Amino acid sequence: MASFHLDHLKNYHRRYCRSSRAPNIHTKKGQNMLEILQDCFEDQSKASFLDDFTESLTSSTQKKKANYSQSSSKKCPESHSKPVPVSSRTGEASLQASAEPSEAAGGSVQANEVHHGASDELDLCVGSPVVLLDANVNTLQKAASPAGQKRVASVSRSPVDRQASNKNISFKTRKRLNFEDKVTLSTAETENSVLQVEDNLSKGQEGTSSEITQKRDDLSSDVQSRSKKNFSELFLETVKRKSKSSSVVRHTAAVPFSPPPPSDMKLLEDEFIIDRSDRSFSSRLWVMIPSKDRHLSAHKPSPENTALLQGKKSREKSHSLSAMTFARNTQSDKAHPIEEAQLSVEENPATTCTDELENDCRSPENKMQSETAKTPPAWERTTKQSQRRVSKPKAAEELRKGQSSWENSNVSNTGQDKLQINSKRNMKDCEEVRNEPNPKKQKPALENKKKTNSTQTNKEKSGKKFFSGGSKNKFVPKKVTLTSRRSCRISQRPSEWWRVKSDESSVDRNPSKENNSPVVYPNKKKQTKRNHVSKRAGKKPGSSKRQKTEMSPRVQKSLNVKDSGGTVSGHDDTSRSQRKPLKIIEADPTQKSLAISRPKRGCKYRNNVMTSPNVHLKSHTEEYTSKTQMESASNSEMSKRSVWEESGPSRFKNYEMPGSSNSEMGDEQDQKSLHFTTRSFNMVPDKKLHHKLVLPSNSPNVRRSNRIRLKPLEYWRGERVDYQESSSGQLVLEIISPSSVPTKIKAQRNLGKVNKKVTKKPTHLNSHEKAKMELPLDMRLGDPFQATLAKDPETAELVPMDLIRPRDTYRFFVEQHGLKVFKTLDTIYFSTGKLVLGPYEEKGKQHVGQDILVFYVNFGDLLCTLHETPYKLTTGDSFYVPSGNHYNIKNLLNVESSLLFTQIKR
């Protein structure tokens, strides 16, 4: 009989498991799959096939003496795994780790028992390829007992099919077989399961303990927790019981068998595999018909993430998830398959919260899937021992809770879209909450940072805690509450960065006070940088990339995770690092710098006090208090010596400008003071000094330069700035400004040279012009170059004498350096002439003797010393030197000066 079914199965493969080049087979919605299968199974009808299957199932189950109930009392994390065909030649049994959809909190699922009879009527429908292939759910094998055959008239459909039908999701139907019964409600499944548990418990007491132990291992994988089975599974189980061979029939292309392909390897589109291994019933026959749908290996939501997402959905619906306390119960019928199978799927520790949220919000079918993870063999032994202690009311209660968890998992598409949008905003929130495995202990911020880097270790530890709790039949309630804000922007008071507090004692080091007082920063960039520095101090240096992502101040301010033991805030590390005040850098006594008082300035000076630029900023109230104290301290130390009176807008009254008046530090010698002193050859007015200095302007709330500026100095007069250092180490500024000589306004005069007439060209007048100017002369004129007849006084006779000396004719001429002496007339009684002095030339001191000298200043400014008295003479002045005296003449101009002299001889 088995060979007959295999032949028809080959025909089915040739007709429907076609290559990718064959056209697609389109089926209408609601069309019965039996109409299509009639061409495949020519002479075999559905009734005859099911009769054979029921017959074989009844014969195999009648050999067993008792039925046993299995229930899950252990929680375990589950993950998806792909079915991989394994040949018997390699000595490994083929296993398909099917994932069961569950609530985020994890609903408890009660295993149902196997009955002796088969269902009378089975309908086949086209199901979702995602549910039937990628999320191959474990189904509950139902065989009606003699007492309960009438109650089971049809196979109940699963909540996954019910959800798919309610949402009217159309899927691409391709070679997918499924049971269809869209009339039976989920409540009938619960009632039938409870009745079956009662019958099985009553019958299980009759069997011996040895048979119970032996049959439990054989039926651990056969008993399923769902109320339906795939057509391929029912068919292959029938073939399993008819033929006992350990060969593998592979109806596909002629290629050699290879090891199990990885999760990302693409198989043939229409590959059809039959595994008939008889190692144990746990590695049962299964058929894999892969499609081109994307693999779900990269989208494995973690149990923590699933719990968080379902918790958010329940808050949006205003429902309290009471079923979260019974999360992740391990199904008893899956214990043996997990023990023998070695799953190749490992949990990725680096899976980010974004991938998990995108995975869970992608489709309703992906939300309904649960995870299967690696479990050591000790877990299964503990599970088998705990299964023997399951009671009747416990099974009924878990069935009701499992049903309620399925009802809560039906979320509308609109809610899913909103959840997907909100999940992207709260990606950081999910990751930090996931790193807290124990809800009753408040973990410090540093410990939570370390657990972020070791996500995989935390998941395994949390999984072990859940399994150990399930073995003792204790359900530990775990309630996680998230308090997050949609808007991450937080309004802050406007920063007043120009206010600086110089008093070191005002920096409060009390952590309680510092936590309450806000820290004001100059701009937003500095605040982000300091947050990064504080976060790096509490984290390991290994994961720098993830630290930068988690250091965002928006996430730290918006996330507050509240546990039952306390509250953990993401802003805790930042506030702790900001509590440490910055060290005040004192001025170096060897470093010189110009400083002047700036009233009400916050950059470096305030009220004639020089402060350090690196001062820890405090709140506005403390700044105002410290400013008042600084003003009073600075006013008490002001000097009284006045240099400038009413000079400038600031009206400085101080001769010496003091440094920082820090009374507590008492280090006034280290602070440099600036002194303004003036030094002049003559007394310089105060306004003159103020005119040269440009002091800093008094402009509050505006950043200005604090240096002292000077107007251009008159360097050609010797005006300069002299910087000196006093004996006390203070810097002194000296301005050297010589007084200017006032110049006298002179009258405009013709200051021609003495020899100007000599060098001047004579003007020749016409005879006609001379006739008009001169009077007519009727006398005879003498010749000036000839001697003149004159009477001698001694003899009284006419004697020719030289009485006229024409121009440019001299009797005596002496030139020495810049001194020139011209004698025009020279007699025994007297002599006349002209004295010329060069620029700044001096004649020298000379004694007169018996003669008398008469001088007339023709041009220039002269310094004349008559005997012992000096005089300043100018053009037009006359003087004479009596006999027996001496005289001296000096030219005060840079030009030649001329004098006319007469010497009287005795």
From Swiss-Prot:
The keyword Cell division applies. This is Centromere protein C. GO terms for cellular component: condensed chromosome, centromeric region; inner kinetochore; kinetochore; midbody; nuclear body; nucleus; pericentric heterochromatin. Belongs to the CENP-C/MIF2 family. Pfam families: CENP-C_C, CENP-C_mid, CENP_C_N. It comes from Mus musculus (Mouse). It comes from the Eukaryota. Residues 702-724 are annotated as: MIF2 homology domain II. A motif (Nuclear localization signal) lies at residues 228-242, 449-466, 525-540, 744-762.
